Amino acid sequence: MDSWHTARPHGSRDLLTVDPLSQAVVGAAVPQSFAPKQHIGTITLLGALAGMAPDLDVLIRSSTDPLLFLEYHRQFTHSFFFIPFGGLICALAFWPFVRKRMRFRYIYIVTTAGYATHGLLDACTTYGTLLLWPFSFERIAWNTIAVIDPLFTIPLLAFIVAGVIRRSPAWPRFGLVLALCYLGLGYVQRDRAEAVGEQLASSRGHHDVAVSAKPTLGNVLLWKVIYRHEERFWVDAVRVGVMGGEPKVYPGGSVAVLDRASQFPWLADGSQQAKDLARFDWFSSGYLALDSRDANRVIDMRYSMLPNEIDGLWGIRLDRTAGNATHVTYEVKRSVDKTRFDNLLVMLIGQDASSISGVGAD
C-alpha cells in the first residue's frame, strides 16, 4: 500500500537534484584537465567543492511555505549569469586555506570552472533548471540523463582519481570525453524513445502531439514516455536498447489533465492555495493530474516508481476548509513495494510485458 507523508522543507529534495557525488566529480574534472602537476590535488578538491556549491540553494526554505524550496532550487545559483559571482564566492571562501599555494586569480579560475558545470549537468536531467535567470523563468530540461546514474559518475570518478595519482591532466580529459559520449548516448536514446511514443500515439489515432521521454533512475535504456492529447495525458514505458533490436513497449494508461475549474470549483482565485497550485503547475511544467486515490491531492505525473504508471512520487494536498492565507501541504511518497521493484527490473532487463505483475498501470 502506498504511503504518503507530509514533507519537511529541509528533507524534500531527495530526487530534485543530481546527486552531490556526480556534481563533485564533474566539477573536479574540468579544472583538473588543465591543472599543473604541482597543484593537481588542490585544484581537484577546489573544483569538486565548487561543483557542489550551487545546491546550497536548498538552504532557502520556510517553515510556513512548503513550496518555497521548489521555487528557489535550481534558480539563481544555477543560472549562466550567476557563474562569475558563484565562482568568486567560492574563491573567497577557499582562499584563506590555499593562499600560500596558489594566487587568488588562479583560484578564481578553478572555482569558476567547477561552478560552471553544475547548472549544465542539472539541465541534462528532467526537472528543469533556470539557466537563463533572471531574463527567463523557463525551466530548461534536456531529458538525457537521470539524477543518479552510476554509469556516468563512476567511470569519470575513476579517471579523476587516476589523474591525481599519476599527476596528469590527461586522465580527466579522457574521462570528460567519455562522459560527453554518455550524455550524447542519452540524447540519442531519448529521441528513439520519443519516436516510439509518436508511433504509439498514432496507433491510438492521436496525431500532432508533443511527445516527451524521460529516463528512469540509473540508466538510459528505460524511458517514461508522456504525451497530451486533448484533455488527457497518456503514459507508457519504452525500453530502447543500445545494440539495436526492437524497442519494447510496456503499455500504461491515461489520466485527465488537471482542470481547476471543474475539479476544485471551491478554490477562490485570490487564495494562497490557488497561488500554490499555480506555483506547483510551473514547477511541473504543466504535467499535473488529480490523484486517482485522493480527490484533494494533485500529483506531478511526470515521475513514478514504474515508468508506465500514473502515480506521482510527490504532490500537493488542498484543503477545502482552509482559510485564504493557508498554504497547501507538500507530500512525498516514501514506500517502495517489492512488486513494483520486481516489475522495474523486468522492464530494465527487457522481458515481455506479460512478465509484469499487476500493480496497476493507471
Describe each region flagged by the PLM.
Residues 1-215:
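N-terminal membrane-targeting hydrophobic helices
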Residues 222-362:
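Extracytosolic and intramembrane catalytic regions of membrane-associated proteins
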Residues 214-217, 300-302:
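Fold-independent oxyanion-binding glycine-rich loops
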Residues 50, 123, 203-205, 217-219, ...:
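A generic structural signal for short, solvent-exposed coil/turn residues
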Residues 138, 218, 305:
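Residue-level detector of flexible, active-site-proximal loop/helix-junction positions
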Residues 194-210, 220-221, 231-244:
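Polar-ligand-bearing catalytic/cofactor-coordination segments
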